[in-house]
Swiss-Prot record:
Synthesizes alpha-1,4-glucan chains using ADP-glucose. Coiled coil: none annotated. Belongs to the glycosyltransferase 1 family. Bacterial/plant glycogen synthase subfamily. The keyword Transferase applies. Its EC number is 2.4.1.21. GO terms for molecular function: alpha-1,4-glucan glucosyltransferase (ADP-glucose donor) activity; alpha-1,4-glucan glucosyltransferase (UDP-glucose donor) activity. It comes from Pseudomonas aeruginosa (strain ATCC 15692 / DSM 22644 / CIP 104116 / JCM 14847 / LMG 12228 / 1C / PRS 101 / PAO1). This is Glycogen synthase. Pathway: Glycan biosynthesis; glycogen biosynthesis. It comes from the Bacteria. It catalyses: [(1->4)-alpha-D-glucosyl](n) + ADP-alpha-D-glucose = [(1->4)-alpha-D-glucosyl](n+1) + ADP + H(+). ADP-alpha-D-glucose binds at K47. Keywords: Glycogen biosynthesis, Glycosyltransferase, Transferase. One of its GO terms (biological process) is glycogen biosynthetic process.
Length: 513
């Protein structure tokens, strides 16, 4: 399974190989550093949130310059969709962590994915993190320690038929033990750890240390001890050579008590050591309104008819009265972090001002119930779907005038970028990646205070713009030109990779090809 990233061109070494007469005898083909990208989600197979999209997109553009392999747990839903999987190695267990095999599959576009094959831990119904009743797996500490230990062993040259990376890139708490296991195993390969959401820390009891085969030093405050528990996330922060977050503003915010989730001290230390930076996410090249096959009709900044066709579809699909006032959209998990309660609080004022509201997503039961009740009280003005469907979401982005994102915090956010691509202006709280990707009054609307009144003021500004068609269209055009695709935003990662590799002794840079 796989897909191609638009705009991939033949790299110079491949051209020279295809035409030997062009190859000068003194010019050997360029060597490519090997990168191991460790993740718990890959949207080709399994996706819970933005990590799955990130893990599918970034390695694909990185492999233009590097030799990249993704390492992923062999979940049941992954194995069911794999073709031509072959076993390339095996790794022993440690303490209560069972042994595993390493499988390799090459996706249709050439991306190589290694799977940690451990049926005891991964072949289950449910999501990567929860059972089908929504409860965390009680052995998550073992499940993801197995992933991290496998990554560390591969970094040390074991388990992958001699394939050894020159750099390891781990992501979020499920793979955060990777840099720590590397350090404890004496593997000096450089490591990068990306924080996608600091609030999810991978906590377990101190007594789990024996099951995880941890050394005594792991129990220190300088390593992964966190208020009497063990934190996978803190282990990644403490032991990785460099830390990134998914936006520049979020990188600053998490060094403060307000946003640091108790880890602001160690993160401030990383800033002082110049080991923490923010890189804004890009988006997949498929988000192109002029050629998106999911849409009812395609459109561009020069031709709006297709956008109106998507609006009519959304109106009919959600039972809204046609063409009466601006259409506001919520495309989000229905959880407190996303500020859904604030949207409910201002909804009556929004509707009284002539607005209409459509929502798609699922989340906390009380917020799902409140959204359904809002739709029941306002038929023709509010439409709600509990659940998520990619095609419906894209049509809502395309058909709406404004996207509501009153997030309490937002490490990066992708919805505002998708909305901008499709000419829907985001209305968002000025935090994290929202602050980095929205220009207030130009490509969307920002508000600062975490209050319903501040939020409502921004909504009313948007309604005023809606009633000025020339200004609305000008903002739409600027918004559609604003988002960066991964093909544009990959270079900061390339620079960081090169710096980490350059600052490591040549003998420790791993095998290259």
């Amino acid at each position: 399974m796989g897909h191609s990233v638009a705009g991939v061109c033949l790299e110079e070494p491949a051209v020279l190989t295809a035409f030997p007469s062009l190859l000068h005898p003194q010019d050997p083909p360029q060597q490519r550093d090997r990168i191991l990208f460790v993740t718990a989600e890959l949207s080709d197979f399994v996706k819970v949130g933005g990590l799955g999209d990130f893990s599918a997109a970034l390695p694909r553009v990185l492999k233009r310059e590097h030799s990249v392999r993704v390492l992923l747990p062999g979940y049941r839903q992954v194995l069911e969709r794999c073709r031509d999987l072959r076993i390339i190695g095996s790794l022993p267990g440690r303490a209560a962590i069972p042994p595993c095999e390493i499988g390799l599959v090459t996706l249709d576009d050439g991306l190589e994915v290694m799977l940690v094959l451990c049926p005891l831990l991964y072949e289950r119904e449910g999501t990567p993190y929860m059972d089908d009743q929504g409860n965390d797996w009680p052995d998550n500490h073992l499940r993801f320690a197995r992933l991290c230990l496998a990554a560390a062993e591969i970094a040390g040259g074991r388990g992958a038929q001699g394939w050894q990376p020159g750099l390891v890139h781990a992501n979020d708490w499920p793979s955060a033990l990777t840099p720590a296991y590397m350090a404890w195993n004496g593997v000096r390969t450089p490591s990068l750890f990306t924080i996608h959401n600091l609030a999810y820390q991978g906590l377990c009891d101190l007594q789990c240390s024996a099951e995880l085969g941890l050394p005594d030093e792991a129990l220190s405050h300088e390593s992964m001890e966190f208020h009497g528990r063990l934190s996978f996330l803190k282990a990644g922060i403490a032991h990785a050579h460099h830390i990134t977050t998914v936006s520049e503003t979020y990188a600053q915010e998490i060094t403060t008590p307000e946003y640091g989730c108790g880890l602001h001290g160690i993160l401030k230390y990383k800033v002082e050591k110049r080991q923490l930076s923010g890189i804004v996410n890009g988006i997949d090249d498929s988000w192109q309104p002029h050629c998106d096959p999911h849409l009812v009709a395609c459109f561009s900044a020069r031709q709006w008819a297709g956008k109106r066709a998507n609006t009519r579809y959304v109106e009919e699909r959600f039972g809204l009265e046609p063409g009466k006032g601006p259409l506001f959209a919520v495309v989000s998990r229905l959880v407190q972090q996303k500020g859904i309660d604030l949207t409910l609080e201002i909804s009556d004022a929004l509707l009284q001002a002539g607005g209409r509201l459509v929502s798609i997503g699922r989340g906390e039961p009380n917020l799902e119930k409140a959204m359904l009740e809002l739709a029941r009280r306002h038929p023709g003005q509010v439409g709600v779907h509990i659940g998520f469907d990619e095609t419906e979401a894209r049509r809502i982005y395309a058909g709406s005038d404004f996207l509501l994102m009153p997030s309490r915090y937002e490490p990066c956010g992708l919805s505002q970028l998708y909305a901008q691509c499709f000419g829907s202006l985001p209305i968002a709280r000025c935090t994290g990646g929202l602050a980095d990707t929205i220009v207030d009054g130009v490509t969307g609307f920002l508000f600062r205070e975490e209050t319903a009144q501040s939020y409502l003021d921004a909504v009313m500004r948007a309604i005023n713009v809606y009633h000025c068609p020339s200004l609305l269209n000008a903002m739409r055009c600027k918004a559609m030109a604003a988002p960066m695709f991964w093909s544009d935003s990959v270079e900061p990662y390339n620079r960081l990779y090169r710096r980490l590799l350059r600052n490591t002794a040549p003998a420790l840079r791993g095998v290259r090809q």
